[in-house]
Amino acid sequence: MTNSVYFQLDSVESLIDELPYMYYLGLFFVNVLILYYAFLMEYIVLNVGIVFLPEDMDQALVDLGVLSDPASIPYDTDTELDVFEGYLE
């Protein structure tokens, strides 16, 4: 019983040994390229992308028309408290 298991393991090991060295060299270069592009994307996001962000996000949203002028309307906090009145009692 154990001899047949050893023969099967030997046959699997012989298949692994028959892979050419260029296969492993190709895997190495694929891994290097993946790491290169990962660090390149990280550099672009962290360093180059920050340049295009405006300093004042509220003003940028006002310029786009998404947000009304934040300085023109006073912020009312009482409306937020009214929502939770039923839960607090």
UniProtKB/Swiss-Prot annotation:
A Pfam family matched in the record: Dexa_ind
PANTHER family associated with the record: DEXAMETHASONE-INDUCED PROTEIN
Protein family per UniProt: Belongs to the DEXI family.
Protein name (database record): Dexamethasone-induced protein homolog
Gene: dexi
